[in-house]
Amino acid sequence: GEYWIDSIPPHWNEYGICKGNMRGGLVPPLSGEYHNDWKDSNGAWIRTEIWAGMAPASPDTAIRYAREDACVDHGSGEGTYAAIFVAAVESAAFVLNDIRALIDIGLSKIPEKCRVAQSIRLLLDCYDNGVDWKVCRNRLVEDSADLGWFEAPCNVAFAMLGMLYGEGDFKRSMILAINCGDDTDCTGAT
């Protein structure tokens, strides 16, 4: 917690809320829960590359680090589940290049009923049934409309949509993920 207060410059959204909570005496994961309307957002899963890089081919180690990091500003929200999912995918990607197998690894690490898993399963259903990527994108948006914009379930699915529908073509994967819209710096970077 002290590192966050002293070294993390942003004061907006989940970052500012968790820092304020810690200054008020709450420790993680409560710092990411209390009065935090952003606990389902994207701030944690976009930081997971470091944990995967520190634990290549070791998803369980990567998700341990990701969970410790994510709970500070996302508590037990969907943002933390997204970080766990993405850290597992990225860590396993050091030794696997089968996108579907990577997604299955990520899904195996998060609760089946969480919204991140729900969005990923909807994506897989669309892909497996030959649904056009734009239609799939719209279904993902509709499915998570109650959460609002800049939320992890839909945006993680957008990143995975790019990889699935891109079918191994890096440029196409990037274009698809970014063209889904919403938090495009997150979806494109992942």
Identify what each model region corresponds to:
Residues 18-24, 30-39, 48-58, 68-74, ...:
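Accessory "access/gating" subregions that flank catalytic or transport cores
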